[in-house]
Swiss-Prot record:
Residues 90-128 are annotated as: Disordered. Keywords: Repeat, Repressor, Transcription, Transcription regulation, WD repeat. CDD domains: WD40 (cd00200). Disulfide bonds: none annotated. WD repeats lie at residues 197-237, 252-293, 294-333, 335-374, 384-423, 431-470, 473-511. Pfam families: Tup_N, WD40. Represses transcription by RNA polymerase II. Represses genes responsible for initiating filamentous growth and this repression is lifted under inducing environmental conditions. This is Transcriptional repressor TUP1. The gene is TUP1. It comes from Candida albicans (strain WO-1) (Yeast). InterPro entries: G-protein_beta_WD-40_rep, Gprotein_B, Tscrpt_rep_Tup1_N, WD40/YVTN_repeat-like_dom_sf, WD40_repeat_CS, WD40_repeat_dom_sf, WD40_rpt.
Amino acid sequence: MYPQRTQHQQRLTELLDAIKTEFDYASNEASSFKKVQEDYDSKYQQQAAEMQQIRQTVYDLELAHRKIKEAYEEEILRLKNELDTRDRQMKNGFQQQQQQQQQQQQQQQQQQQIVAPPAVPPAPPTPVTSLSVIDKSQYIVNPTQRANHVKEIPPFLQDLDIAKANPEFKKQHLEYYVLYNPAFSKDLDIDMVHSLDHSSVVCCVRFSRDGKFIATGCNKTTQVFNVTTGELVAKLIDESSNENKDDNTTASGDLYIRSVCFSPDGKLLATGAEDKLIRIWDLSTKRIIKILRGHEQDIYSLDFFPDGDRLVSGSGDRSVRIWDLRTSQCSLTLSIEDGVTTVAVSPDGKLIAAGSLDRTVRVWDSTTGFLVERLDSGNENGNGHEDSVYSVAFSNNGEQIASGSLDRTVKLWHLEGKSDKKSTCEVTYIGHKDFVLSVCCTPDNEYILSGSKDRGVIFWDQASGNPLLMLQGHRNSVISVAVSLNSKGTEGIFATGSGDCKARIWKWTKK
């Protein structure tokens, strides 16, 4: 009996030793794997730091290049002014010489008239009749000059006084009027559908993807209206913003909603404001379900990705951020040299465009964060914007970007999509007499609409660059313009938000 117990004990000891050996082996393996993981983490952090350093170096080089370029431009301008001064001096000397020659000729003629026979009186001049025919060449953009940054403003946009406008090329209503380009037939008709009064300046307007609703942003309040009826269906106010008087509160106590954007399914609404916060609202309950924190200055622009899971934001803190709404975390931060005023996501979600105070439109890969294009005056034609870019919008096919600037122009950029070719400015739209504050493209890529501080909205023919008409429908700056995505070829809906505390919904009809 005792020998059998000894055998069991030996067997148990062997099993325990085997288990100990396995445990030691597993511990060593785990330690090895942990060490490998730590090595990988260390390498990843090192590479990420190197990538950030490279990116910062590139930004520093861009800034240095811009300063050098501006210095060269100033020197060129100085030399040009010197040449102009010399030309004027030479011209004045030549004119004085001509005047002396003319005086000598007149003296000779007077001497001849003393002895010459009386001349036959000249025939009366033929009366000149004023032509009522309009010279259309003054109103049409020369195809060879489409992309030029400097062009003449068409005459019908020079004087916006409706009383002086040709009756054949205007439409006048009690609350608005339309001026038409005389070089084209009046194919487009504009009518106001709804006028929506607000208690303060309307900073932004945005349609839902299905075109059934429109959201507006003003002081402390976001409102959602039914597009068909004009009925107010939601009034969104974050009451906690009044209670939490912290660093996010503005000195004046105001809290302007700078940007609004519907999610693709229309269930959520994102709002960006002066308090550096992005609020995500559930429209069915009219409650905030998420607050995204991270920006250090005002939020000026928002746009959803097509999948609805991500949101891009632009801020005065010189950054563009991509947010993962599933985690409420920022997944990517893109930093630039100056404040970001506007952002847009391409229709396929692969690209992000942003306009900035530094006169540049940047385009990034939305996945990697790599800078794909920089659209500015550094292009080979030197026809980029000459002042801050306040609005960008992708065309419906994603191949072009429209941009509006404080230099009073709208530009259309063609995206090459190839590393060996740079994107170019295809068209420069000239016609506004003050800052361009907002731009948008119609779904069929036929028209570009722009709103300006000159209180007007211009319909541009996207391909030719010709202004077709100007709508004067507000008593203050047109801060925001948006087009409904369900607009068709022959008719469409667009909206405007203004400093006159009104948002208006309009309809265009193509005859």
